[in-house]
């Protein structure tokens, strides 16, 4: 990758990442206000939404030909990378354990991982259906 393409990719990732992080904040804030702080609904929601959209986008960018690289940087690496958050998932699990609510950790991890996997496959199926020539 030459220097110009590298810088273009970096700018696309930063732009998408800023938007994705802002979107994560908005979704998390709305769900916190609606459901309270008893369960990390915001992190769960953004990770499941991100899984679905990533599956869809993976198929969609493959259909873009040579422009697919730029779209991948902007939308998958940037936007979805900024929207979803593995570190928050782990921190929330630690908080549950430290607050003597460790039984919820297994439930939270199972839901996140199982539904995340399901959603990425569903998004890819939708992407294949929508992008089918």
Curated annotation (Swiss-Prot):
What Pfam families is this protein classified in?
CRCB
BP GO terms, sorted: cellular detoxification of fluoride
Q: Which UniProt keywords apply?
A: Cell inner membrane, Cell membrane, Ion channel, Ion transport, Membrane, Metal-binding, Sodium, Transmembrane, Transmembrane helix, Transport
Q: What InterPro entries does the entry give? A: FluC
Q: How does it sit in the membrane?
A: Multi-pass membrane protein
Compartments it resides in: Cell inner membrane
GO terms under cellular component: plasma membrane
Ways its activity is controlled: Na(+) is not transported, but it plays an essential structural role and its presence is essential for fluoride channel function.
Q: Catalyses which reaction?
A: fluoride(in) = fluoride(out)
Membrane-crossing segments per the record? 3-23, 41-61, 76-96, 103-123
Give the source's domain of life in one word: Bacteria
Signal sequence bounds: none
UniProt KW Ribonucleoprotein keyword: no
Kindly list the GO molecular function terms attached to this UniProt entry.
fluoride channel activity; metal ion binding
Does the keyword RNA-binding belong to this entry? no
Binding positions (Na(+)):
81, 84
The role this protein plays is: Fluoride-specific ion channel. Important for reducing fluoride concentration in the cell, thus reducing its toxicity.
Q: Which family does the UniProt entry place this protein in?
A: Belongs to the fluoride channel Fluc/FEX (TC 1.A.43) family.
Protein name (record) = Fluoride-specific ion channel FluC
Q: Which gene encodes it?
A: fluC
